[in-house]
Amino acid sequence: RKNGTPVTIRDPNDATALGIGMIHQHFKLIDVFSVLDNIILGAEDTKLGFLQKKKARQKVSELSDRYGLRVDLDAKVEDITVGMQQRVEILKMLYRDNEILIFDEPTAVLTPQEIDELMQIMKNLTAEGKSILFISHKLNEIMAVSDRVTVLRKGKYVGTVETKDTDKQALSNMMVGRPVQLQVSKEPAQPGKVVLDVK
């Protein structure tokens, strides 16, 4: 359902027509194309059969500024960082005017600094009225950016809770179906006799 209306999504074109876009864990970019070409590919604006690249560049630049997604539009994708490639994926979805963005394990390939930047980008997007579905098993990130959490276990719905009304312990229990010990206390290791001495 979208806005209470049942919908059928057979392919990415159906999703885009409904304003739904997905940022995959493994990016769907063409390395030898420029950033701009990757963003507009498949959604090219044409007039009398001619590509309106200047108009597309202006729209992408405006989106980039609006959401804090700075990236060199002329750089080749193969020459930019993984974090920048993710920004390109996000801009692709925004260029298509998607209102619902699905992030599939988006932090799996990012550095800690890039993760912090992504969290801020997601907050900027929601502040502008975008809806985000954030698929993750990283509880710290879920608690930092979500308003509501839905837990699935083995592909089945377990429950939905408001983030403000839960904690990592409760979410862990929902995820595995039993109480989970998040903090493990154990005695410091006691070394045994030397078995190899290298000089």
Specify the residue positions occupied by each region the protein language model found.
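Glycine-rich phosphate-binding loops of nucleotide-dependent enzymes
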Residues: 1-199
